[in-house]
Structures are given as C-alpha cells and as structure tokens.
C-alpha cells in the first residue's frame, strides 16, 4: 500500500477509533495515530487492515475546527488530497487539506446507500443487527475475559482471575501449591486485562526451558499470539525499530536475555502495561547482596504498572525469600524484613478470628473479643447477635458471618497482594498410590562401578551420587556408544512386561536424561514393537507437540510417552493415570514436578506411581528417604525443599556409600523434622488467606454462570448463521466438532485466523479440553470476534428492503426500521464500555412517524418478512422517497431521546460504582496499607475522564430496513 505522512485512513477492524493519520513510515512498518482516542497503531505496510479515506464531489466534510466544506473538486499533491468547495460559515470558496479533517467523522451513511440503490440482502440486515447485539452483550458482561479461554471451569482459578483481572495495574503474587494451575490463573488475568483494555503491552519472563511452553499455552488456551524474543530476534527487529521490544505488543523472553544491560535498558524503555514472571522463587535475594536476576526483575517492576509473580508457596520459600517477592510488588509497603516478621505474628489473631467465622459453631468469647478489637472502627454488635442467636434463619446467620469475614479480608493481612491455594483447601485431587518393584543389580553395572572406583578421579559428592543413581550412564562411559545396556537391565524387562499387561492404559515414563529416554524407546520398539514416543529437550517445540498429540490419541496413538527430566517441564498429561519413574531425581521438588505431570486438578482417576529399582543400591536408599522420610510419593511435600537443604550432605554420603545404621539414623532425623515442619505449617496456615484465595460460594457462582453461558444454544445459532453469511464452509466432523474452511464465495477477501487448510472447532468445552487440536468457540474467540468486526466494520447489511405479507394491513403500508448505535470514542483502557458500550437502538416507524418498537418485537416481525431483489427494492425506495425523508428526522429524535437516557444511566452507574469503590478504598487505606495510592488516584482520574467521554457520546445510524405491505 502507498503510504504518505498526513494521509487519512480508517481501521477495518477497529472503526470506533475514528479517522486515523499516518505519522510514521519506516521500513516495512507504518504507524497511524487515531486522534479521537489518542492511540497509535503500528502495521505491516503490506498487510495493514486499513482503508484509505477519500471523499468525492457532492460530499460534505467537517474540519477539525468545526466548519464544514461542501466539496466541489479535489486535487492531490505529494500523496495528500486537498478538497475545494464552499465554506459553510462564510459561503465563500475554501480549501481543506485532508490532514485537517475532523477525526470523529463517521463513514458510509446507510441512507446514502439506500437512496443510491445499494441494497443488501434481507438476511444480512438481520445478521448485522445480531452482531451488534452480541457485541453489546459481551461488553456488558461482568465475566468478560473468563469465558473464552480453553480451560476447565475450576472455581478457585476463576475466582482469582475475576478478582485480580478487573483491577487497574494488578500487582499480585500467585503462590498456589503445585498442580493447582498458577499458569492458567496468570493466563486468565492476562486475557482479561487485554480484552478489557486495561493492558495492551505484556512482557512475560520465564526460564529458558519454558519459553516455548508458555508460547503454546498462551496460544492454545487463551488465543493470545505472543512472540518469543531472544538475541537473534532482537537483532532482526532492529531493522524496524531502534528498540526491538516495540515491534510486538505481547512478548515472552528469558531472564538470560535481560541480564544483558543493553536489552534490559530497552525493555525498561518499552512502556509495558503488565509484567509476568514465572518461577519467581528462583530470584535470589538478601538485603546485602541481591542476585543479578532479582535486580533485573526489580528494575522492571519499578517502571511497569502491573506485575504478576508466579512462585512456590510461602511455606516452601521461607520467610526471607517470601518477603523478597512481596518487596518487588510494593517496596513502600514491604520495606523492612523485621517489620514484616512482626506484622506476620499479628496475623495469628486474625487467623483465629477468621477460622471461627468460617465454621458453623457459636463464637467463643475470645473470638468475639478478637473480632471487636480487629474491627474496632466498625460496630459489629448487630452481626455478632445474628451469629449467636438460637432461633434464626441460617441464611441470615451465614450472611452475617460472610460480611465479617469480608471486613477482615479487606482490613488485614496480605489478601490483596497474595493468593495461595493449597490442596487442603481445594477439593478434587485423586489419591496417589505408590508401587515399588525391586530387582537385582546386574553384574555389568557392578563391574562398571568397580572400574570407576579404581580409576579414581576427583568428583563432588553430588556427582558421585548422580552416578550411583544412574548406573546405565556410568556403564556407557566405559563401553562404546552402541552398548545396549537395556538388553540386560532388569528394569527394562519389567517395563516391557508392565506395558504388555496394561495394553489399554496410557503410561507416562520419566527418566533423568534424554539418552536414557531414547534408549528406552528403542528397547520397547525393537524387542516388543510397543508403540511409544519420546519427549526430550533436544526436540523442537513442533516435534514435542506432535509427540504429545500422538500420545493423547485414543485410537492408534502411542501407549507410552517417555520423557526426560527437562523435556517434561511444564507439560501436563491428566488423561493418563499411570506414571513410571524409571529412576529418581535427587531433588524432592523435581520428584514432585514429575508426579505433578499427572497429579493435577482435573485428573479423574487415582494415580498409580510405579518405581522399578535396583536392590541394595543408592536407588533403594533414596527411595526409602523419599518414602519413609518425606512420604513424598503418596502426598505432596511442601517442606521437601527445606528438608533437602538441611539433610543434603548426610543424604549424599548415605547414597554414595553409607551403611544401614547411617541410613536408619538419617530416616529417623528426617521423619522427626518432617513432622515438626508439617505441624508448624498447619499451625501457621493463614485461614483468612485461604478463604480469600479460593473464593468459596462466590467462586462457585461464577463457575455456574460460565457453565450456563456454555450451554447458550441461541449464541451457537447466531455464530453459525454469521459464518454462513460470510461464506465459511462448515463440515460436520462428528464428536461435537466442525471443520471451518474458507469457501470460494467468501464475502470478504480475507478472514484473519481462518487458514486455507481449515480449522477444527467445537462449542463443547469438554471436547476442547480433551483435544489440543480443536478450538473452543465462545463469544470471546478471535474467529467470532473477527466475524463480528468484519460485518459491523463494513457496510454489510446497512440497507435492506422487505415485503410484509399481511392482509390485516392495507397494501402499500410502509414501515421504516432503523438501527442506531449509541457510543463514544474513547481508549479501551478508559473502561467506558462498562457504562456505555456501543449500544444498538431499534426504532420501528409507521408512515405517520409513530415508534412501534416497544409493541412489535424484532424476532416476530423479522419472521413475517420476505426478501425482494435489489432491482425491485431500488424502485420501491425511489417511489417512497417523499415519505422516507421526514421519517429519518423523526427516527433520529426518538433515538436521541434514547441516547440521552442511556448516557444519564451510564453517568449515574459510573458515579455510583466508582464513588462507592473510592470511598471503600479510602476508608480501608486507614487500616490496611496494602491499598496503594495509585489505585485511588486511578479511580479519581477515571471518573473525570469518563465524564468527559460521556459528554461526547454520539448517535450513528447503523442500518435501515424499509418494509412495504403486500397482499400478493
């Protein structure tokens, strides 16, 4: 496309932005400023979804100063158009450069198209109106952003997303126990922030090994197209912008990249709205010497308004490390470690009071005294009387308990910045059943161990332990690469027999290294022809996806998936319930990570954990330490990290060559310390935090509403009709799924997101969750949103003529149906749509100008209408022009009255909600320092901005349908 500075263009997909101006043309990119909203958009010059705006003689245009010009002719110079005509205020000849046009000008007036004979098919008018209604319905939903993602409707996840996602610039720590879905919670929050306009630019920092996993997760689950940035990508992007991070809105990168000063400086200068940091517990910090990684995240968290930290539970982190994460979120609030510890001790009284309220029993005197002291600024006596009363409605008592709990949550603890769910507070997890299978140590391994000992060599204790735990690796060091250890290792024989006896079961096998995983696949294939696939760090993301899909396939798929330690990070396989641990990792957290591939919320079966091991070896001793010392196979062990840190040296000595007495002594000490830590964690459980994190009945209510929305057959019908009209080919594939393909008769030349080879979709959430290759279609899905935008952003369905066959009315009776849109140009981030989203207003006029829309509903009226061809329709319009012109003026009067009422309601709702929230937060700030001043300032500014935008609300005629009565 030929672009020049100052040219005026309109966005095909975001027409609400108004008239745009080209402000930069550089390399392959063009930047357009939309003055109505103050927003910039950067597009690829070759594929920009933009339409050039050039008016014709006879049109009237408005200047940015407010005067109009009746165009008589136009000229072009240096790619810019100059309009010449008559000035509306002076009546003299004048010229107007296109750069000085009013940016709020609306385009393609339906009445102009109607009188020009550009008449659309009847069904297109209907689908346009349905599209406007769907957009309004979505914009007004308080669950916006929660329905679209391809995730299970799990209460605590939806609750956290609902609470955090609707905040301005949320700064929170997501610290759920392993398996409870922190990544999904973060994705839901990101999705909601983007969809509502609270955020536009997002940076996700993850460990290097998880970059592509996050990329796939964001795309498959949330339909968010992130870009992975590494050094090569930064160098390549330099051609388009001095700062590579400005070339994309959604970016994933590793901490390694940002350790480089140049890249960190660029990231700091990139105006992110939201920063997400995964595995934040690896950021080491002490007051005297914070790590480089911690300093990188700290620098970013100081300039990025919203921050999400995904981390291990506070129990696993230890107090100082937990404080370090909170300090990143709010350094003013968490400024001193000793002060933090003192405050934490005061939470115990709050926890006792919360536990009393969360139960059903009468409150003790101690609990009442504690509540009275904690909520001293509020009169809680009426609520206490309700709770203590004998003969009173249980719902009233429960409401009183809930109200006091909410007061505690608002005023005390870290509930606004920390969310931590535990398995103790979230139900729905399966049992873990441990099965161990002893085998004799092969002579070949014993020989390799003796040779290794004779050769000596300096090795750390940890390296020696690693060798002892994986004898097959040591054996291969002394044999050539083709040495087939799997031909004599009894664990391999056991594995083959196990798979043969469980033919119908999917089995996940995890080994420590990629070489071991590849050798096992070779053994299964060559010895028994067992269908297995591998999954390791040497494979590309596409290869791993294919392996995962092959394993997930029910018919004709692999029976077993063999993963390496690193290769399995971040991947979950809940559809399998058998886990074979071919060896054991040295770290309890890695063991939990392995089991966590299956032991996740949503797993429907008990998990069978199988461990073949070699007797009288380091493998057996480590098994005993995990099983007898930590009970780590059958239960999660939040204290595993602490216990390993404390007993690592003793454990390594036992593994490398300790005797039975040393092992017994280690087990006794470990068991004793395990019980101490478990008791301390139980005592220190923050009941208030748990209640706030899982959401209770409120979370269940959100999930019930989302489930009802999934079953909305009316919505499904509207979406299918939309695709029919656009020309999308739909092939029923069975199993609740449809294949969508562009047909030869597409209404639009391109349909972003719909590929030539098609896409498989479903309206059923369970089907989508069981198949990675099937997209879940909801109102929020890009394929639906794009379809709505294509229709409403074009002139499709803006004019129509129909016949009403009704002998009760005189032949020739005329009705004029007008669809207006009430809206205002405002940045998405202003949240104006919460109060005045683009709203369709229907007016149905008879020939006398009476509005019948309240008496004649759209659906029943539409069913009685018949289409006419364009030629006849054009003649009917021409013949009816004398009647139509005054009706348009009358229709606008009715619509304007409706808009005035909508604006008044929007203003009242906005003032009520924001004033109420501001008053609440201001009063809470006096007793809870977790309320940030930025949040209060944001609310004050938002009220002023929204009031200005509401004053500038506009009425636009969107579609016209002329209806004539016929008896033929």
Curated annotation (Swiss-Prot):
Helicase ATP-binding domain location: 163-332
GO annotation (BP), single: regulation of DNA-templated transcription
UniProt xrefs under SUPFAM superfamilies: P-loop containing nucleoside triphosphate hydrolases
Limits of the Helicase C-terminal domain: 491-655
Enzyme Commission code(s) on record: 3.6.4.-
Any GO molecular function: hydrolase activity, acting on acid anhydrides
Motif (DEAH box) on chain: 278-281
Pfam family, one: Helicase_C
Enzyme's top EC category: hydrolase
Residue positions binding ATP: 176-183
Keywords: Activator, ATP-binding, DNA-binding, Helicase, Hydrolase, Nucleotide-binding, Transcription, Transcription regulation
Quaternary structure and interacting proteins, as annotated: Interacts with the RNAP. Has a higher affinity for the core RNAP than for the holoenzyme. Its ATPase activity is stimulated by binding to RNAP.
Function: Transcription regulator that activates transcription by stimulating RNA polymerase (RNAP) recycling in case of stress conditions such as supercoiled DNA or high salt concentrations. Probably acts by releasing the RNAP, when it is trapped or immobilized on tightly supercoiled DNA. Does not activate transcription on linear DNA. Probably not involved in DNA repair.
Assigned protein family: Belongs to the SNF2/RAD54 helicase family. RapA subfamily.
Protein name: RNA polymerase-associated protein RapA
Species the sequence originates in: Shewanella sp. (strain MR-4)
Gene: rapA
């Amino acid at each position: 496309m030929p672009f020049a500075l100052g040219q005026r263009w309109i966005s095909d997909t975001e027409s609400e932005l108004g008239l745009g101006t080209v402000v930069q043309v550089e390399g392959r990119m063009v930047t357009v400023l939309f003055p109505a909203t103050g927003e910039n958009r950067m597009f690829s010059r070759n594929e920009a979804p933009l339409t050039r705006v050039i008016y014709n003689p006879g049109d009237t245009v408005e200047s940015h100063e407010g005067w109009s010009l009746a165009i008589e002719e136009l000229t072009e110079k240096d790619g810019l158009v100059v309009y010449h005509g008559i000035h509306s205020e002076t009546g003299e000849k004048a010229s107007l450069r296109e750069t000085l046009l009013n940016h709020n000008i609306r385009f393609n007036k339906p009445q102009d198209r109607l009188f020009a004979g550009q008449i659309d098919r009847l069904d297109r008018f209907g689908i346009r109106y349905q599209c406007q209604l769907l957009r309004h319905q979505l914009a007004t939903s308080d669950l916006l952003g929660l329905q679209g993602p391809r995730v299970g409707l799990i209460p605590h996840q939806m609750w956290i997303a609902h609470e955090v996602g609707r905040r301005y610039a949320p700064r929170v720590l997501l610290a759920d126990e392993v398996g409870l879905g922190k990544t999904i919670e973060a994705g839901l929050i990101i999705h909601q922030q983007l969809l509502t306009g609270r955020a536009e630019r997002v940076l996700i920092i993850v460990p290097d090994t998880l970059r592509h996993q996050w990329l796939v997760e964001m795309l498959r689950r949330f339909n968010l197209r992130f870009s992975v940035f590494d050094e090569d990508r930064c160098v390549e992007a330099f051609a388009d912008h001095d700062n590579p991070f400005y070339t994309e809105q959604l970016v994933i990168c590793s901490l390694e990249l940002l350790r480089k000063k140049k890249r960190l400086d660029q990231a700091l200068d990139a105006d992110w709205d939201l920063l997400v940091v995964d595995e934040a517990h690896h950021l080491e910090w002490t007051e005297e010497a914070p790590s480089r990684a911690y300093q990188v995240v700290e620098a970013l968290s100081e300039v990025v308004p919203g921050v999400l930290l995904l981390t291990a539970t506070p129990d696993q982190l230890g107090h100082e490390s937990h404080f370090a994460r909170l300090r990143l979120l709010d350094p003013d609030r968490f400024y001193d470690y000793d002060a933090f510890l003192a405050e934490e001790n005061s939470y115990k009284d709050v926890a006792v009071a919360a536990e009393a309220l969360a139960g059903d029993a009468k409150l003790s005197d101690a609990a009442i005294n504690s509540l009275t002291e904690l909520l001293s600024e509020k009169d809680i006596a009426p609520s206490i009387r309700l709770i203590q009363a004998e003969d009173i409605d249980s719902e009233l008592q429960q409401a009183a308990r809930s109200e006091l709990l909410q007061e505690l949550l608002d005023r005390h603890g870290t509930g606004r910045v920390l969310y931590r769910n535990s398995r103790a507070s979230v139900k729905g997890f399966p049992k873990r059943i441990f099965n161990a299978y002893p085998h004799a140590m092969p002579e070949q391994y014993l020989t390799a161990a003796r040779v290794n000992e004779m050769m000596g060599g300096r090795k750390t204790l940890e390296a020696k332990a690693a060798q002892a735990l994986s004898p097959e690796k040591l054996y291969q060091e002394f044999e050539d690469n083709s040495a087939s250890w799997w031909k004599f290792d009894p664990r391999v024989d056991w594995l083959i027999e196990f798979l043969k006896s469980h033919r119908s079961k999917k089995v996940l096998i995890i080994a420590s290294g990629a070489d071991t995983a590849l050798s096992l696949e070779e053994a299964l294939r060559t010895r028994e022809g067992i269908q297995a696939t591998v999954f390791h760090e040497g494979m590309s993301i596409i290869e791993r996806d294919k392996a995962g899909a092959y394993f997930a396939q029910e018919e004709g798929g692999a029976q077993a998936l063999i993963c390496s330690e690193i290769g399995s990070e971040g991947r979950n396989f809940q559809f399998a319930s058998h886990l074979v641990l071919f060896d054991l990792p040295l770290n309890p957290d890695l063991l939990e990570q392995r089991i966590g591939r299956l032991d996740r919320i949503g797993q429907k079966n008990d998990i069978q954990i199988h461990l073949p091991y070699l007797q009288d070896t380091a493998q057996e001793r480590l098994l005993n330490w995990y099983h007898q010392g930590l009970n780590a196979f059958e239960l999660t062990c939040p204290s595993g990290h602490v216990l390993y840190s404390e007993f690592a040296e003793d454990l390594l000595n036992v593994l490398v060559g300790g005797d039975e007495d040393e092992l017994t002594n280690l087990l006794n000490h470990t068991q004793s310390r395990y019980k101490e830590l478990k008791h301390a964690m139980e005592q220190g459980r923050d009941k208030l935090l748990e209640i706030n994190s899982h959401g209770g009945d409120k979370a269940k209510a959100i999930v019930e509403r989302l489930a009802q929305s999934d079953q909305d057959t009316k919505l499904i019908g509207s979406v299918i009709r939309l695709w029919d009209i656009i020309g999308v080919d739909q092939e029923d594939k069975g199993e609740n799924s449809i294949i969508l393909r562009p047909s030869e008769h597409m209404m639009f030349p391109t349909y972003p997101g719909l590929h030539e080879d098609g896409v498989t979709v479903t309206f059923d959430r369970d089907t989508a969750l069981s198949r990675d290759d099937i997209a879940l279609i909801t109102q929020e899905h890009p394929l639906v949103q794009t379809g709505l935008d294509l229709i409403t952003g074009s002139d499709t369905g803006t004019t129509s003529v129909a016949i009403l066959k009704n002998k009760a009315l005189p032949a020739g009776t005329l009705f004029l149906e007008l669809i207006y849109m009430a809206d205002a140009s405002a940045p998405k981030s202003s949240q104006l749509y919460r109060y005045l989203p683009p709203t369709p207003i229907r007016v149905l006029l008879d020939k006398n100008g009476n509005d019948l829309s309240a008496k004649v509903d759209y659906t029943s009226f539409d069913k009685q209408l018949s289409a006419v061809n364009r030629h006849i329709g054009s003649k009917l319009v021409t013949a009816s022009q004398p009647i139509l012109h005054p009706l348009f003026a009358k229709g606008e009067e009715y619509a304007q009255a409706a808009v005035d009422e909508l604006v008044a309601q929007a203003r009242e709702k906005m003032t009520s909600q924001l004033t109420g929230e501001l008053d609440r937060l201001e009063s809470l700030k006096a007793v809870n320092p977790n309320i940030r001043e930025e949040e209060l300032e944001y609310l004050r500014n938002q009220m002023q901005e929204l009031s200005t935008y509401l004053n500038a609300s506009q009425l636009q005629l969107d579609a016209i349908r002329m209806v004539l009565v016929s008896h033929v």
